[in-house]
């Protein structure tokens, strides 16, 4: 069975596709794992529920795919379930070994869409009936709790941010979600809450950290991950192409594609590289340690930047 796992391939047409089923599958997990790997490598954001196996358990193997393939970690988000008191729900699996790419979200007593498998013939609901095509989903609404309620919350946040930042790639959207999360529990990334509770109010103001390996606690670091030193942002100019030559290539037609501003204070060991013909304004007091490169277009610093700033021929500060 694929139990309550939300696999969200965030399509760049500003819609989301979610699979949140409890239906049996006729084959093993290898084809599903291959599909997840392929989706992540083709620019999709994979949002996975951590599972409902109590706080002291850790996520199952499929959530740990980035340990085998660290190149997809930035396109993966694992989600735990918070109670109304911002505590990890007693039923929720903790972030555990996935903490460096895990966040938390409300998932207790959520009124939402639900679906149940029912037999078309009045028979049993089991694998054999599924294989025969005798089952269908009866949709409806109801109150549910669990990480399968928390994960769609994060999917919704990602969808809003893809509209807010139409020029960003899925891995950059993931970075914004992680770095703007409200810290819970032990300071910083921890094994229960990961980066913390997702915070859309802060996320719409841009990233709060340019992440590198140095920003991840050693006990949660996935070897080979967070290897990029620069957050490369392409403000392309109105009507120009972003992520060209990829499966998510698209024309950027929103006003943010021509001018955008980030007002959060940005920290971290990474740096910023500005590309594209448009303008990006930094409004916060930024302490990130990496270099700032203006390769194309305009970077307006209306707050402050502590790093070294370099300007190439077609760039303007």
Place the predicted regions along the sequence by residue.
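Surface-exposed loop/turn positions within long extracellular repeat scaffolds
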Residues: 57-61, 171, 194, 265-267, ...
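Tight coil/turn sites that cap or link beta-strands
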Residues: 236, 245-247, 251, 296, ...
């Amino acid at each position: 069975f694929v139990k309550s796992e939300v696999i969200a391939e965030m399509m760049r047409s500003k819609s989301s596709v979610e699979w949140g089923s409890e239906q049996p599958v006729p084959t093993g997990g290898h084809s599903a794992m291959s599909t997840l790997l392929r989706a992540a490598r083709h620019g999709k954001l994979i949002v996975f529920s951590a599972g409902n196996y109590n706080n002291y358990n850790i996520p199952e193997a499929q959530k740990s795919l980035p340990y085998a393939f660290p190149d997809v970690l930035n396109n993966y988000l694992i989600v735990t379930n918070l109670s109304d008191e911002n505590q990890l729900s007693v039923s929720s699996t903790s972030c555990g070994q996935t903490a460096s790419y895990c966040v938390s979200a409300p998932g207790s007593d959520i009124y939402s869409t639900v679906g149940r498998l029912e037999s078309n013939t009045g028979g049993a609901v089991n694998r054999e009936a599924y294989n025969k095509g005798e089952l269908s989903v009866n949709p409806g609404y109801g109150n549910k709790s669990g990480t399968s309620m928390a994960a769609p919350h994060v999917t919704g946040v990602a969808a809003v941010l893809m509209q807010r930042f139409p020029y960003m790639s899925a891995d950059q959207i993931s970075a914004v979600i992680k770095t703007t999360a409200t810290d819970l529990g032990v300071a910083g990334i921890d094994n229960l809450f990961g980066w913390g509770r997702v915070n859309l109010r802060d996320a719409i103001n841009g990233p709060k950290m340019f992440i590198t390996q140095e920003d991840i606690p050693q006990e949660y670091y996935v070897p080979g991950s967070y290897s990029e030193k620069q957050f490369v942002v392409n403000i392309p100019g109105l009507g120009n192409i972003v992520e060209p030559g990829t499966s998510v290539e698209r024309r950027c037609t929103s006003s943010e594609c021509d001018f955008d501003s980030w007002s959060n204070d940005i920290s971290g060991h990474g740096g910023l590289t500005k590309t594209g013909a448009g303008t990006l304004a930094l409004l916060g007091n930024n302490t990130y340690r990496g270099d700032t490169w203006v390769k194309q277009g305009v970077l307006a610093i209306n707050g402050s930047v502590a790093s070294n700033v370099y300007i190439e021929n077609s760039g303007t500060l």
